[in-house]
């Protein structure tokens, strides 16, 4: 099977999703994108070393151009909720992050199926759909 999956965000959730994908037969290529290049490179090295006995799979720390023609894109980017922080305060910070990501990934992977994992999920999904122009049936 040849399926390309991109994970945007190499934090705890994104790195765990990328690792889990690397263990199964869901993807033949996994691209992990994060604004923190050192973090994403370290996470990808861990994944590659932890899956060395699996069938050949390509796992790379990349950028949006590497995500071109992805079949599935999973967006996990965002700031975690801090103690005492309201859902609205969290939403505003993460909306700004989503507004930056959405047009970049939509430009290179317009036919992908998108999974939004960033919190608050309902708001982030709405923002992604509006900013990216990706049809709702792909999100």
Describe the function of each predicted region:
Residues 86-139:
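Rossmann-like NAD(P)(H) cofactor-binding subdomain of soluble oxidoreductases
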């Amino acid at each position: 099977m040849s399926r390309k999956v991109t994970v945007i965000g190499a934090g705890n959730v994104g790195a765990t999703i990328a690792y889990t994908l690397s263990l199964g037969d869901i993807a033949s290529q996994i691209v992990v994108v994060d604004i923190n290049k050192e973090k994403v490179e370290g996470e990808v090295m861990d994944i590659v070393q932890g899956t060395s006995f699996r069938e050949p799979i390509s796992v790379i720390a990349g950028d949006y151009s590497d995500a071109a023609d992805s079949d599935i894109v999973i967006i996990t980017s965002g700031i975690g909720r801090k103690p005492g922080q309201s859902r609205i305060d969290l939403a505003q910070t993460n909306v700004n992050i989503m507004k930056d990501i959405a047009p970049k990934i939509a430009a290179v992977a317009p036919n992908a199926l998108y999974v939004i994992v960033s919190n608050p999920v309902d708001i982030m999904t709405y923002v992604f759909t509006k900013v990216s122009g990706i049809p709702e049936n792909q999100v």
